[in-house]
Amino acid sequence: MNRYRTLIRTSLLVLVLALLLLPMPPGNADSEIKVTYNGTNIESQTSPFTRNGAAYVQARPLLNAVGWQVQWLDKTKFKLFRSGAAIDMEVGKTDAALNGNTASLVHAPILSNSTLFLPIRSVSTLLGLQVNWSAAANTVALTATGTKPAPSPYRIVAYYPYWASYQKLGLSSFAASGITFINHAFANIREGEVVMGDVATDRANFAELKQLKRSDPELKALISVGGWNWSAPFSDVALTAASRTKFAISAVRFVREHGFDGVDLDWEYPVSGGLSSNRTRPDDKQNFTLLLRELREKLDEAQKKDGSKYLLPIAAGASSSYVANTEMDKAASIVDWINLMTYDYHGSWEKTSNHHAALYSDPNRPNSFGASANDTVSAFLKAGVPPGKLVLGVPFYGRGWTGCGAAGNGLAQACKGLSEGATSAGLHEFGNLEKQRWIGGNGFVRYWDDVAKVPWLYNKMTGTFITYEDPESISYKADYVKAKGLGGAVVWEVSQDFNGTLLKKLTQALK
């Protein structure tokens, strides 16, 4: 991997230097510079211009033409991105980073009248474009090199919940960096049919997903149905042949109407568990399989008519009771893959601090048995699920308590209550941990459990304990995915990592 990164850096440097040796023709000062991409003019409100010997072009028209997007991180810092690639840049600075690898620009981006302009030569190199100048025509001709980062052999699935829109964390902010599937959460169920979960945000999000897919045809978007709050109707939906058919037909209609590539079924949970108000039945075990089979048949029928492949994954609970209450061997033969919710093994419903997403159980702590990703994966494999259909869950949030005892640096101690979170008590988005500088700062010390392969934070002054995921623990989970031959990783949920720290690590680790 280090040799590969060195090769990337060297290639970029050689390419930039080679381009710099080509003279920049001044052109006719009275004539307008034109920029084309694969022979087509790039139209912009502000014409390209030269400054300090460099030609500049308005950013958005250029990026739209070549299939990239821009996201502002603050007043001067921004990111250019497409699936599998991201370039970090800053106005007035020549430093840049391509997929985390240091790069350098000869000329810096500039901001004029609140509009971003990019130096054509330097940026085109990072975008993977060839640059040709025609002095006679005063034209910059950009062409695609045909090179594109090799896709990961693993599924990288990211849930995006509708409520992230209310926090101004739009889909486009997270759709780069190697995500292969976006699960929009959640659609609801009314009168036995799939309906929008939140009309106020869903229409805009669905339109944005379509735009993202146009920019990256390899990206797939699925609608996730149900979830923790909206699983109450599932038992009734799965009860009879008529109710199953009605649901399946509505799901296919929803997928077609809104341009999705399939349905992610998130029933929490068959037979028992979930909200206390949920209706469950012993027959849910068999009916769940029948519901999946009916939905698969209807999606396959639509696939033959539409010529589009429609996917059917499910979200699965991590507990042994979930395996006991389902027919996972039969379900696995129907679905495309299984998103394992390998997190929330411990949390706000308990009064003792513990890891909520351990990779391995600790034999020295009996209460950790059955509460690790490895335990869950082992249970599903034992139930007859092929490893390639299991996608390991990775949380982008932490759980926290306060008033926890100091023994063991706060781990496995009695606590007085839940820690204060940015959005709810006891919940800590990774992005907010970074924002508040709690990771090894502001009174918190980071500790590492070398058995469970996860970190935690502890503040001795307040007794606050936070269990969370970080780049180191993600590396171990990515290695586990590879070693076990699993199908990839699934993130709950991508907006909680609004700086992209964890997502970048995950996608790099699964290459």
Label each region the model flagged:
Residues 182, 223, 265, 295, ...:
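Conserved, mostly hydrophobic/aromatic
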Residues 152-154, 178, 217-221, 259-261, ...:
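Short, well-ordered coil/turn segments that N-cap beta-strands
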